[in-house]
């Protein structure tokens, strides 16, 4: 069954077959593209007419390869689409981590096409818009879930058995250094001297930082747990956008979540306590 590569190609007939594992016997009678835009991938919101009741959402968020050919080439090279599909199919069911309810996770190894169709999180959760940070308590809860992921895969043998397709991110790309250089050059006055100093140090010698990351214990990482990849449901947070999973130091996830999910004032006040909390949770989980 060929995979659709544009939102309008997600037909009722295709979706009926695709959701068969998740909701067998459900017939999708209609699909309406409510919204569509290009991001790292191509995103669309689909409204469904179906006979499955609560077994299938009536609104789906759909992630497809980007339509722009340059972006598509970069995405295919990165393996992000396949990695995220495999996460939802192979790992997510066994993890004690909150993730979206996914009804289609498919990848075509010959063409690089992929489809991820999941619940529209806005119907049951708060999806941050990036203007405000999360509370320290929510970040602490998120660190507990990351700790569960990290503990599960700190054993190299288990990683080889369950997730051999997740590998170290390596250091072949200078994308981060180029992005920092462009930001500094575009408007240096908008950045604090402290930030510029750290950025310049990274640009000049990023291998030293990479050496430090690679020196310690390794595990499977989410890889990109910033505020835009989180949702809040009750007193817990959940994680989505798993396309940058990698093997590396667990402190990459920990530091990234603390730095990117808290307001600066909260981070200054609570970051040490949060690091201690993560260590205690790790120790309690073995």
Mark where each language-model region is.
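Active-site activation/catalytic loop segments of kinase-like enzymes and analogous catalytic loops
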Residues: 86, 251-285
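Surface-exposed helix-capping loop/turn segments at secondary-structure junctions
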Residues: 94-99, 153-162, 283-286
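ATP-dependent phospho-/nucleotidyl transfer catalytic cores
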Residues: 125-222, 233-234
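Glycine- and acidic
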Residues: 70-74, 127-132, 240, 256-264
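Conserved NTP-binding catalytic cores of kinases and kinase-like/nucleotidyltransferase enzymes
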Residues: 1-111, 233-237
């Amino acid at each position: 069954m060929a995979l659709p590569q544009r939102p309008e190609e997600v037909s009722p007939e295709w979706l009926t077959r695709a959701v068969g594992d998740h909701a067998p016997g459900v017939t999708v009678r209609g699909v309406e593209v409510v919204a569509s835009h290009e991001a790292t991938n191509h995103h669309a919101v689909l409204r469904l007419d179906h006979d499955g009741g609560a077994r299938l959402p009536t609104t789906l968020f759909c992630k497809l390869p980007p339509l722009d050919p340059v972006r598509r080439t970069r995405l295919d090279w990165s393996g992000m689409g396949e990695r995220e599909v495999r996460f939802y199919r192979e790992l997510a069911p066994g993890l004690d981590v909150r993730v979206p309810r996914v009804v289609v996770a498919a990848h075509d190894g010959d063409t690089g096409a992929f489809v991820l169709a999941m619940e529209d999180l806005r119907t049951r959760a708060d999806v941050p818009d990036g203007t405000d940070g999360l509370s320290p308590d929510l970040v602490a809860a998120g660190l507990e879930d990351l700790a569960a992921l990290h503990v599960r895969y700190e054993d190299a043998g288990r990683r080889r058995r369950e997730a051999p397709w997740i590998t170290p991110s390596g250091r072949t790309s200078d994308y981060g250094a180029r992005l920092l250089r462009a930001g500094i050059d575009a408007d240096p006055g908008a950045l604090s001297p402290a930030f510029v100093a750290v950025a310049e140090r990274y640009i000049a010698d990023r291998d030293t930082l990479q050496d430090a990351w690679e020196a310690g214990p390794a595990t499977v990482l989410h890889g990109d747990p910033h505020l835009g990849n989180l949702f809040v449901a009750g007193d817990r947070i959940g994680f989505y956008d798993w396309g940058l999973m990698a093997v590396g130091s667990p402190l990459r996830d920990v530091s990234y979540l603390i730095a990117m999910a808290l307001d600066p004032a909260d981070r200054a006040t609570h970051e040490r306590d949060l690091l201690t909390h993560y260590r205690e949770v790790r120790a309690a989980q073995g």
